Design a protein with these regions (language model features):
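Hydrophobic alpha-helical membrane-insertion signals
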Residues: 1-27
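Anion-binding and metal-coordination hotspots
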Residues: 2-5, 70-83, 93-507
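Positions in alpha-helical segments
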Residues: 14, 60-64, 106-107
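Short secondary-structure boundary/capping segments within folded domains
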Residues: 17-19, 51, 213
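Basic, short loop/linker segments at the boundary and entry of helix-turn-helix/winged-helix-like folds
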Residues: 22-64
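Short alpha-helix boundary/capping elements
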Residues: 37, 67-70, 85-89
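Short amphipathic helix-turn modules centered on a small-residue break
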Residues: 40-46, 88-95
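Glycine-rich, N-terminal phosphate-binding loop and its surrounding beta-alpha-beta segment
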Residues: 58, 64-68, 72-75
Length: 507
């Protein structure tokens, strides 16, 4: 007999939470973290009288759902929450409740949260939760910057002249004080210079970049990732024409102050290979791993070697060039370290004509203002620790950018202004952190349950096979024995324990 739906209307008393699967991502997020702290963060932006507003926690959760599931349009986000029961439950709305209009997002953002650091505080609170769960330890970190294009027409690009305040001190305060104590340092008065830049009439705060294949206007996203579970611990946004090496030290220092995070090792890319960055990392108590740049005026190309114990260069004739003073490079506004030969030794040297200009009295070398730290940093290149950190940087730093751009609405910046761009980047990083937080915690809980259920009733060999099967991306039968042994070595290690201490199998 063929069945057919009657279509009869029925009354049903239903708890919406019962419809959400136990393994749903939003249910796991709701179990792990409570967002009630947002009420205290935004309390000062709401008056004590008048009509009740939309719940700020529900408002934030709705935005978070959009970034978790790659829903960039706020109009479409409202439609999805209206239809999806899991989204409704996570945002705190029952089946019969009306979802706020899409214009509520923009009105709340402009009237209440636009000039605040609410999203930054929420991001930091989530990171603190990860630290409490021991998902972040600071032992191995990776930092990098990435260009995020702005959603503007190329026809809106214009060249404008702006006045920029030029100062020769732009790193850490401790590093600036250290430079100020050296001979030859003179603090110049800050002055403004006229500079021609490319920007967009649509978004005046974005910057222009032309580096290799990257060309356009947008923003520079600077992030730091903990390599233990890939939790993003720091997010800063700048115009795309800013230089990464000038921003990284204060970016890391801010995380140490706000999170109380003790960083031990940080992996960076080649663009951060400057003496100031190497020395700044040392002052922050961080061991830096940075690929070395082969500079065209490297003294080693001309047969000079550096003695780190005496802080001197040794010329091919065996004479020492000692540190003399700091010299200011007026074209770049930075200080250089001047090393030179003492006395009139160069006048009698047979290699004088090929060593330096005959108009000079002695051989000089201009190096980075923090060359000793620069040299120490280069000694770590190609060591086993360096190669290990470079692999971690590719996985977590570059991988996090790829994931946020592909899955969490960060392929472009579609809002206007650096504050709105920062909001987008923070929400994308929060979505990534929550997913990785859930994966790390619930994977550990699941593995603990397997061990607890099988430790007594199953032999160790069979237990290890179960764990091996769960840790491999494909069943063990579909991969080679050699690949399986490299992927998971615990069964071989414990086979000797099973032989020495056999366990009886329950029958």
């Amino acid at each position: 007999m063929m069945g057919r739906q009657s279509g009869q209307i029925s009354m049903l008393i239903l708890d919406i939470e019962e419809l959400i699967p136990e393994n749903h991502l939003l249910r796991k997020i709701n179990q792990m973290i409570s967002f009630d702290f947002i009420y205290d963060l935004v309390a000062s932006y709401y008056p004590t009288n008048g009509r009740p507003s939309v719940d700020p926690v529900s408002m934030f959760k709705m935005l978070l759902v959009g970034y978790l599931y790659g829903i960039k349009s706020e109009r479409r986000l409202v439609q999805e929450i209206q239809l999806n029961i899991a989204y409704r439950w996570f945002c705190g709305y029952e089946l019969g409740e009306k979802i706020p209009d899409h214009s509520t997002f923009s009105k709340t953002r402009v009237r209440k949260w636009n000039e605040s650091n609410v999203f930054q505080q929420i991001f930091l609170e989530i990171v603190r939760c990860c630290i409490e769960q021991r998902l972040v330890d600071g032992k191995e970190m990776a930092a990098d910057g990435s260009y995020i294009p702005a959603e503007v027409s190329r026809n809106s690009w214009i060249d404008v002249e702006v006045e920029v305040e030029q100062s020769m001190l732009s790193y850490l305060d401790d590093l600036n004080q250290e430079l100020a104590s050296q001979p030859g340092f003179k603090k110049p008065p800050s002055h403004t210079v006229t500079k021609k830049i490319t920007t967009s009439t649509t978004d005046r705060e974005c910057g222009y970049i032309h580096h290799g294949s990257k060309r356009g206007v947008g923003y520079l996203l600077e992030t730091t990732v903990d390599c233990k579970h890939g939790i993003v611990t720091g997010v800063d946004v700048f115009p795309a024409n800013e230089k990464e090496s000038l921003l990284i030290l204060r970016h890391l220092e801010q995380q140490q102050k706000l999170l109380g995070l003790s960083m031990e090792k940080v992996a960076l890319d080649r663009g951060y290979d400057t003496g100031a960055v190497h020395r700044g990392l040392e002052l922050l108590g961080i061991t830096g791993y940075i690929p070395a740049i082969r500079f065209p005026n490297d003294p080693s190309k001309y047969g000079f070697s550096y003695d780190p114990q005496q802080d001197t260069f040794i010329c091919p004739m065996g004479q020492s060039l000692v540190y003399h003073r700091l010299n200011c490079n007026k074209s770049t506004g930075k200080y250089l370290r001047c090393y030179q030969v003492q006395g009139d030794i160069c006048k009698k040297c047979p290699s004088r004509e090929g060593c330096f200009d005959t108009a000079g009295a002695r051989r000089r070398i201009l190096a980075s203002s923090c060359y000793p730290a620069f040299y120490r940093g280069h000694l770590r290149v190609n060591t086993p620790e360096y190669l290990h950190m470079m692999r971690k940087r590719k996985i977590w730093a570059e991988g996090s950018f790829a994931t946020m751009k592909r899955e969490h609405n960060l392929s472009t910046i579609h809002k206007r202004g650096i504050l709105a761009a920062t909001e987008e980047c923070l929400l994308s990083a929060m979505a990534l952190n929550l997913k990785r937080m859930v994966k790390a915690v619930f994977s550990a809980v699941f593995m603990d349950e397997i061990w607890a259920e099988n430790m007594i009733s199953q032999p160790i060999r069979y237990l290890c096979q179960q764990v091996q099967y769960l840790t491999l991306p494909v069943p063990p039968a579909t991969i080679s024995r050699k690949a399986a042994s490299h992927r998971f070595s615990l069964p071989g290690y414990l086979s000797g324990i099973e032989t020495a201490f056999p366990l009886k199998t329950n029958t």
